[in-house]
Regions:
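Active-site bordering "gate/hinge" segments
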Residues: 1-382
Length: 383
């Protein structure tokens, strides 16, 4: 939730939003625009006038920092000045919002990024229903309050802004198509069985942009890594493909000595191996997760996706595009932000029922391990 909002406003929005154009926006018209798409309280003429003045002071300072080297006023920017001022205001609000939201990471994970409480068999943070440490009733209340704040911002700021911006860039619904094949590992199991069918976000593969059929099941044995264009060598040569648990990481740098301007992409040019499913490159990430969920019949994902497509007046093929990837992050953010409140309620119910187990120590002692073993694990990254 936090990652997609930050990606939209702080890592990606300036591809669509011209900050300099916001300086010529009419504050009253911006207020009217904001109120036409959301009932977010920070929508008054006075508010947008203050934001515009703040931006003007920043520009007049001459110290533009990361905003100094950009394509301001480029004709490819489509938003009107009022849309740019609205987005700029929410860029600033999102900075404050994410500072609050990541308190959930600190409560459950110790820090952000890179949580510190995960370890073999569970988590190190205890359930403490009768104390003041770990997860206790006050912490549950704090988590619920933060989750509600997160959901409100997603519903009233992020999604309306995303739809507003997308409505001015509909041509991008036909641009940026990838390979057309999608893989999602799935996430958020509803029990401890390990059965992929119990994943709240489903697992599977969609080939050929086909949303009419259920996703194909994942077979981890089909995952392969190539080093044909990578600075490594494999036993068996560059044409060999290896499952990660059979993988080799033998450095063999053959690129130019620095400084250099270009890499020869017809040869080896990267430290990254090239993963394939069988011999097929697959798209992963937010769009892949939403495509697989849609094809799998995930009710809420289908509902929100259909609403977004209808609002923009585009068909399902628009998902497989640059615009589709932007929309997919918003769709995923909303459905997970909604679900977070359910998960907090479930955690509270577990604690109230006396189920305070946070760790399974059956395999904690190395003396219980076999002399040799092979295993595999899969997980998703937000972006």
């Amino acid at each position: 939730v936090q990652d997609h909002v930050i990606h939209f406003y702080h890592l990606h929005a300036l591809d669509w939003v011209d900050i300099t154009s916001a300086l010529s926006a009419d504050a009253a018209a911006t207020s009217a625009l904001a109120k036409s798409i959301s009932d977010w309280p920070n929508s008054s003429q006075t508010y947008f006038q203050a934001v515009r003045d703040r931006l003007q002071t920043f520009v007049d300072s001459g110290q533009l920092g990361l905003f100094a080297n950009a394509y301001w006023s480029h004709p490819a920017y489509k938003l009107p000045p009022e849309g740019n001022l609205l987005a700029a205001a929410h860029y600033l609000e999102a900075l404050d919002w994410q500072r609050e939201v990541i308190k959930m990471h600190a409560i459950l994970g110790g820090k952000n990024p890179h949580p510190q409480t995960y370890h073999l068999g569970g988590m190190s943070i205890p359930d403490d229903p009768n104390g003041q440490h770990g997860i206790f009733p006050g912490r549950i209340a704090q988590l619920r309050n933060l989750a509600n704040q997160a959901l409100e911002f997603v519903q009233k700021v992020y999604l309306p802004d995303l739809l507003l911006v997308a409505s001015f860039y509909k041509e991008w619904a036909g641009l940026g198509q990838g390979v057309g094949d999608y893989l999602a590992y799935g996430d958020f199991p509803i029990d401890t069985s390990g059965d992929p069918a119990t994943l709240w976000l489903p697992q599977g593969l969609v080939f050929g942009k086909d949303l009419s059929r259920p996703p194909q099941p994942l077979d981890h044995n089909q995952i392969r890594e190539y080093v044909t264009r990578s600075w490594y060598t494999y036993t068996g040569g560059d044409g060999a493909a290896k499952h990660p648990w059979d993988g080799e990481t033998e450095w063999a740098y053959s690129g130019p000595q620095p400084p250099f301007d270009f890499l020869d992409t017809d040869g080896k040019y990267s430290w990254l191996k090239a993963p394939r499913y069988g011999n097929t490159p697959m798209e992963v990430g937010p769009l892949a997760r939403m495509v697989v969920a849609y094809a799998a019949g995930h009710a809420r994902v289908r509902e929100v996706t259909d609403q977004v497509l209808a609002h923009l007046g585009v068909g399902p093929d628009a998902l497989f595009s640059t615009l589709g990837r932007v929309a997919a992050r918003g769709i995923e953010t909303l459905v997970i932000a909604e679900k977070m409140l359910d998960w907090i309620t479930e955690l509270e119910a577990n604690i109230n029922s006396g189920n305070v187990a946070m760790h399974n120590g059956d395999l904690w002692d190395p003396s219980t391990w076999p002399d040799q073993a092979m295993g595999w694990g899969i997980s998703e990254a937000p972006r």
